[in-house]
Every structure is written in structure tokens, then in C-alpha cells.
Amino acid sequence: MADKKGSTGEKLLYCSFCGKSQHEVKKLIAGPSVFICDECIDLCNEIIRDEAAISEKEGGLAVKSDLPTPHEIRQSLDQYVIGQEQAKKILAVAVYNHYKRLKHLGKKDDVELSKSNILLIGPTGSGKTLLAQTLARLLNVPFVIADATTLTEAGYVGEDVENIIQKLLQNCNYEVDKAQRGIVYIDEIDKISRKSDNPSITRDVSGEGVQQALLKLIEGTMASVPPQGGRKHPNQDFLQVDTTNILFICGGAFDGLEKIITQRSDKSGIGFGAEVKSKEERDVNEVLPQVEPEDLIKFGLIPELIGRLPVVATLAKLDEAALMEILVEPKNAIVKQYQKLLAMEGVELEIRPSALTAIARKAIKRKTGARGLRSIVEHALMDVMYDLPNHKGVQKVVIDESTIAGDGKPLLMYEEQPKVAGSN
């Protein structure tokens, strides 16, 4: 009954759903011959929210509705990563298609879209890890970096491959739904290659065995992870994480792969019309983009793993010009970072072009790529950063070629006259 007569004869209105009178609730809203109170409306809203969350889990993972286009992804990568244009294009398309696929999940269709995991091949310090980190930050998804060299088969001393998923969960406060649409970057994947391209008769717990374990994770499995970082034991309840929709990016330097590619291309280039090139002429940057699955198998990756990494992007070895650009151009450029640090002391930092050239050449000589740039700049500025808080009146610090070479010290510019760091 929506209305009754009270003891005083007044007509009382009641909620048609919970039966409470108009005096027991804050608001009673009338419809055609029915009434609903504010408490029932709140309850209905809560039920709708819960059901929407359940259908989102079953029908498809929550993915950013404003997914950036490949061009927008590429532009964002350009702000942090210098060069590697082809690799950025390949990554932008692969990541866009992956998250577009997640939006498509749960829709009834004849076509099932497969996941496109990525393999990055390039020298140390060429930007493999930075590309993966930048992508995860752009898409605002959980991200974890795993080192393949620390992994072993289950049951052996070392990290289990499922520890990767545990770290991913930690990075998103153990929200399983978020982790299931995250990005995993596995570094040093080339270091777990089997020792020869023939299957081994002995146990290879940190090579082929790890590849087999990673294979299950990458292609999609239910990983059992102990809650809140606990250790595994038999009577424990595990969190179940489906890795089917996690994007895996594997990276490695693959030292020596260019020789395998060259040998293959030399065999196919025999005859009168073959172009003869000396080995010295064959630049790594020219050879690596010609990589084929058979080359990776010969290097020591198992065919099944290569099949699960269909998108292959090669990164070029960075030259002097690229390294100089990396020092000053990106949003998080090393020179900008040190200028900011010194600006906090009220001091301007100037690194002259000759010094930038010297830094780039030193990194090339060390064969550390962009990764080695920071340590060179840090070493050059160490004494200045140590002494600066105690020096009053310093306006500017100048770094030139001699500072990088170790022949001279940074120049401290005072209001009155220049003074060399460390001099009396």
C-alpha cells in the first residue's frame, strides 16, 4: 500500500518498496500510484554501480577510453627518446593495437584478436628500457621491469617467473584487474638463450628452462601469486592473475646476432650478381634490421618463444650527434636535470658545446651508450656540487672540454672575478 489513514485521520504516504512512512524518511518521491523513498534510491544506485563493475570485469577490462593514436604515442615518445624513429613507429602501432584489442574484449564477434608482444633488439644504452617506461607512463598502466638473468626454473635457487607478476601487483597495490592490463618489460632476454641451437640433453635451469617458463606466462596463464608479497606455502590462498592481456615487451642487446645475420645473408648472396662487401663495411645499424626468426633461433631463443613475440623492433647504435642531442633535448635531459639542481642553489650551469662533444665521445669509447652519459656528467660536477653550498656569491658554473677530459676543473663565475674550483 502506498497510502493509509493515520490514527489522527491524516493520510500517510508509504514507500512502495521498503514500507517506511513519509515521517521515517527524508524524502518520498511520487510516481504513478507508487512512491519511493531516498533510502531506496541510494540502495538502487549502489546495486547498479556493483553490477556495472562486475560486467566490466567479465565483458572486458577497463581501458582508457581516450586511447591515444599511434601518431600521439609517437609524439609522446619523441619528448623523451631521441632517434630510433622506426622502433618508435613499430611500438606505437603495436601498443595501440594491443589496447584497442582490450576494448574489443567481450564483444561477440567471429574474429578473435591475438596479442602482439614485442621484442626489442639493440645495443646497451640505446633506449629499450626508456621506451617501455615512457609507454607505460603515457598509458597510465601498471609497469614492471624484470631482469631475465635473475630468473630460474621453479624449484631452483633464484627468482621464479611468477615473481614478475607479483612485482606488477605490488606496483598497483594488489589490484588484480589493473595488473591484468599492465605492461611487463623483461630485460636481458638474450642472456637466457640456450648454449647452442640444438636442444640440450643436460638441465639448463637459467637458459632454455626459463624460456619455457616465460613462454607460459607470455602466451597467457593463470599465475598464482601469494597475497601482499608473502612467501608461497601449501595452505595459503593465492591471488589468481590472468596474464592473457598483459603486454610483454622483451629487450636485449643480442651481442653477436649481427654475425649470424651476416652469415645467412652471405650464403643467400652467392653468385655473379652478388654484391660483395667487406665485413668492416657492414655496420651493425645496417645489419640488425634484417633479422629473421631463424637468426634468433640460431642465437639461442626457442622457436615457441619467438612465435609469441611477433613484433620485432631493432634499435640503432647511438652515434655522437644522437648522444649530444640526448644530453640537451628530451624533457628529462641530463643537462636540464643538473641545471635544475644547481638552480636550487641559485647558480646557473653552462656546459659548452665542446664539453658536450667530449661527453658523447667518452660514452662511445666506453660502449655504454646513453646510459653512460649521466655518470660522466656526475663525475665532472662532483667537486662543484660538494663545495657549492659553502661558496657564497657564485653566479655561474662553466664546464668545458678540459673538465670532461680531466685536465681542468669547472670554472666558478663570481660577481667580481672568475675563480677555478678548488683553488685557494
Swiss-Prot record:
SUPFAM superfamilies named among the record's database cross-references: Glucocorticoid receptor-like (DNA-binding domain), P-loop containing nucleoside triphosphate hydrolases
Disulfide bridges in this chain: none
CDD domains for the chain: RecA-like_ClpX
Residues engaged in binding Zn(2+): C15, C18, C37, C40
GO annotation, biological process: cell division; proteolysis involved in protein catabolic process
Stretches assigned to the ClpX-type ZB domain: 3-56
Key words of the record: ATP-binding, Chaperone, Metal-binding, Nucleotide-binding, Zinc
Binding-site list for ATP: P123, T124, G125, S126, G127, K128, T129, L130
GO cellular component, one term: HslUV protease complex
GO molecular function, one term: ATP-dependent protein folding chaperone
Keyword Metal-binding: yes
One Pfam match: AAA_2
Oligomeric and partner information: Component of the ClpX-ClpP complex. Forms a hexameric ring that, in the presence of ATP, binds to fourteen ClpP subunits assembled into a disk-like structure with a central cavity, resembling the structure of eukaryotic proteasomes.
Family as reported in the entry's similarity comment: Belongs to the ClpX chaperone family.
Matches recorded under PANTHER family: ATP-DEPENDENT CLP PROTEASE ATP-BINDING SUBUNIT CLPX-LIKE, MITOCHONDRIAL (PTHR48102:SF7), ATP-DEPENDENT CLP PROTEASE ATP-BINDING SUBUNIT CLPX-LIKE, MITOCHONDRIAL-RELATED (PTHR48102)
Function: ATP-dependent specificity component of the Clp protease. It directs the protease to specific substrates. Can perform chaperone functions in the absence of ClpP.
Protein name (Swiss-Prot/TrEMBL): ATP-dependent Clp protease ATP-binding subunit ClpX
Source organism (scientific name): Ralstonia nicotianae (strain ATCC BAA-1114 / GMI1000)
Name of encoding gene: clpX
